[in-house]
Structures are given as C-alpha cells and as structure tokens.
Amino acid sequence: MVIKKEMKTEYVKPLVYTDRVKRQIVVYAILSFIITFLLTKNLHNYLNLVGIISIYLPYLLIYLVAIITNPIENAIKKGFENEARDILKNDDNLIKIGITGSFGKTTTKNVVNDIISSKYLTLITPASYNTPMGITRTIREMYKPIYQVFICEMGADHVGEITYLMDFVKPKYGIVTSIGPQHLNAFGNLDNIIKEKMEEIERLPKDGVGIINLDNEYIANYKINNTCKVLSVGIENDKADFSAYDIKYSNAGTTFKVKLDGKAATFKTILLGSHNVTNILCGIALARELGLSKEEIIDGVANIKQVQHRLEIKKINGFTFIDNAFNSNPVGCKRSLEVLSMMNGKRVIVTPGLVDLGKEEANENYAFGAYMKDRADNVILVGEKNTEAIYRGLKDSGFDINNVKVVNSEKEAFNEVYTKYSVKDTILLENDLPDAFIH
C-alpha cells in the first residue's frame, strides 16, 4: 500500500553541536573530573557516600553547569543582540516592517515579501524566526547594505515581548494580522493578549503606518493609543480602507476584487481561504504605502508562493490534499473548513484537534467539531482522548456519526484515506502531521 511506503521514510535532523552545547560539554567534563577526583581521593573512607552520590551526580552536574554557563550565555546573547541593534541603527535608509498577531504572522510576512520584492530588495526573517535571538541571527548572518526593506515577524507568548521587539527593531510600519486565545496559559487572560499584540501599533513612530484587520472583533473594538496613520483591511467590510469582495475558491486557488483608485481590481492567488485574502489585503495596503502601482501589486499577488503546511494544496499519488498542518487555531480551522466545503468530491478532514488553548481547549474543540457540519462529509479523528470534545461537537450538531472514524495514530489515518477514498475526493489535513508527509 502506498501509505506504507510514505510512512517508512524517516526524516531525522542530524545532531548538531552548537557553540553553546560545546561550552556546556566542556564545563560538564571539568566538573565531572573535579568531583570524581575529590570523591575517589579517599575512597576507602567514604565508600557508602560515594555510592549514594554517584546516583545523583548527573543531576547535580547538570544543575552546576546551568549555574556556571547561564551568565556566560546571557552575556554572549546580549552582545550578539547589541551588534544587531547597531546594524539596524546605522542604516538610516532601511525600511523596517514589523508583523505580529496571534496567527497569520508567517503567512502575512511571506505575502508582503512576495508582493513588494518586485520593487525592493528585501531581507526577511526566515521560517518562524520571531524571537529576539531569531531576529538577531537573521540580522547578523543575512543583512547586507544593499537591502532596502527588512520584514520582521514578531512573536510573543508573554506580556512585554512585543514591547521589547519594537524597541529592538524600531519599525516604521506595523501589521497586526489577528488576535485570539493563542498561548492563553502563558498570557494569563485574553485582555493581556489583546494589549500585547496592539503594542505593535501603539509603539510605532508618529510618522509610522499601522495596518490592522478590522474583521477581528478584538482589534476592531480596541482603542489605539497612537496618532500615527492607521489603515484597516476587511472582507466585504464597508468600514475598511481596503475591502475584498466577490471571493471565489477552486483547486487552482482564489480570485477576489478590491477597489483601488476608485476602480475594481481583480486579484488571483494560489492561496486558499478567506484569512489568506485578509493577509493579502494587508500586503496590498502596505504596498500602496510603499509606492507600488496597481499593476505591480496585481502581479505581486499573482506571484505569491504557497507557504508550507498552511492551506497548501498538494497532489500526492493522485490525491488532492489541503495541508494545514502547521499550528492550527480556532479561527484558522474554521477558515480551512470553509475552503473544504467548496471543493469537489467527498470532503474529508483529518485532525488530532486543537492544542495550547488553556481552559478553553475543550470548548474550542467542541465548536470545531460542530462547525464541521455541512462543511465536511467525512471526519477522521486522530487520538480518542484528545478528540473527545470534537466528537461531542459533531454528534450534538447532527453530523452523521457513521461518517466519523477515530484512529490511534497518523499512520492509521493515512491508511483510512488511501483505502476508503478516491482521487476525486479532497482531504484536509488540519494540524500536526507525520514527518513522512510534512517533508
């Protein structure tokens, strides 16, 4: 069976000894030598004690290594960061863009880059590099004076982190993609999340430009404490400065219209989902501020590349998969289902459910299950325990439970797909997937 061939392939990252690990190994070895020497020097007097200590010695050594090396590592880290700050500070002509949000950051970052790179030489934080060290590494290792724009993804799962990154990068342009209960445990409550994400706009300079998603209720209801220019985007939203309408989906992607210069402009993209239309609107709004013409923006949108594992269309063994395996969330999963509902053949969703939602996890998964009604024909749930709330949501919504299959592993899920469905069907993979598929 094809799935067995897929699952047999192993994708394991090779072990890499970083400079930090090497320093820790050296300290560990020195401490081991010293303690072993002291214990064995008078071994005959402390034989019983040596036996007891040897059991706990590895834990003691790890603790001591951390105590000794942490100040050194922090100093090195701070030095690297200061070097990155100086690089940004010394380039007065560099246009800096910050992008944050509970979800949609990475996709929006890539969308912005694809749209404006026809006019500007851009430096972009790779993958999901959105922490101080990730940003520092990007600047130190990839920056060159020829770059005209720095597009920086900014992540946060604790209060104060966006403030820190804004002080670090000092962008003139800021985008807040969306806000929701992501990392709720770390933030404590939703109000902290809202306030933290909106720091992206509130800490822009007075001549800066903020771009916000007006369809997000938390953003729309937030009173921004800044006098900088703020542009809004939305879908069929008359209050938004940039609004998309006449949206159509197919296996080839999405088409939609936006009014530019008072006239309707038609955009085509390979990306799927209304949330991706919102992400593109953010890119369109920013591109206008950066001086791109309507034609340049239309071409830029058409050239947007798919982002791996974010509603990415894949053809494997003749089957059509919609891969949304990366970091599914309460908003994104509903958008995925909306896309699935417009596809041909049987509409199948494979999911292990939503995670990292704190006390709201069960409620959000229940709502996720209920939302599948009329949007999916068949459901494959991976893991009985963690998908129990989804199952209840499906059942209570009136979904035909005979079309729900609960399996214990991703391998079983793929077996189900390849044996029960045909190449005419569409399979949505929502949230984490096995390495054999992802790679």
Task: Give the positions of each predicted feature.
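A polyampholytic, Gly/Pro-enriched intrinsically disordered region
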Residues: P145-F150, N251-T255, S422-P434
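Acidic, Mg2+-coordinating active-site environments of NTP-dependent enzymes
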Residues: V176-F321, G345, A370-N378, T387-K405
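Conserved strand-to-helix beginnings and helix N-cap segments that scaffold or border functional pockets
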Residues: T136, I162, F187-L190, I280, ...
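ATP-dependent carboxylate-amine ligase
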Residues: M1-N70, T227, A285-K294, D299-H439
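Short, surface-exposed amphipathic charged segments that create phosphate/polyanion-binding patches used
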Residues: I139-E141, L190, D241-G253, F414-T426
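Phosphate-binding loop of NTP-binding sites
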Residues: M1-V27, F33-L214, Y218-C228, A287, ...
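Fold-independent oxyanion-binding glycine-rich loops
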Residues: T100-S102, P126-A127, M154-G155, S178-I179, ...
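Glycine-/small-residue-rich active-site loops that bind phosphorylated ligands and cofactors
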Residues: G104, N130, D157, Q182, ...
